[in-house]
């Protein structure tokens, strides 16, 4: 799993990013968790929940997190939230491949 390898190279930095941005949970899905990943063209697909009730703060954290993850992974990152997924076919596709990679309640990387 490509995403696992990238995170394990800089585990402390990844954990700090998740804590700084108050991530409640973070899932990876799509090609980065399958054998379909292409090092030249694939992006990283992430599903995140931020633990912040203020919509402005939550939005600012999401934008900052997206920018930081693109720097961390050195590639394009698609960052989605549960509430942004309205298409049932997309939801089913995400649910079929998603893997929990960070649990904010335990402040632990799970890969």
Predicted features and spans:
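Catalytic core of pol beta-like nucleotidyltransferases
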Residues: 1-27, 33-40, 51-111
């Amino acid at each position: 799993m490509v995403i696992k390898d990238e995170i394990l190279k800089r585990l402390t930095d990844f954990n700090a990013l998740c804590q700084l941005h108050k991530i409640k949970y973070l899932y990876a899905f799509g090609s980065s968790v399958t054998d379909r990943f292409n090092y030249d063209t694939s992006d990283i697909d992430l599903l995140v929940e931020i633990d912040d009730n203020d919509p402005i703060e939550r939005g600012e954290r999401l934008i900052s997190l997206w920018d930081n993850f693109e720097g961390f992974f050195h590639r394009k990152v698609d960052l989605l939230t549960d509430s942004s997924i309205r298409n049932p076919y997309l939801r089913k596709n995400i649910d079929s491949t998603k893997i929990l990679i960070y649990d904010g309640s335990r402040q632990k990387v799970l890969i």
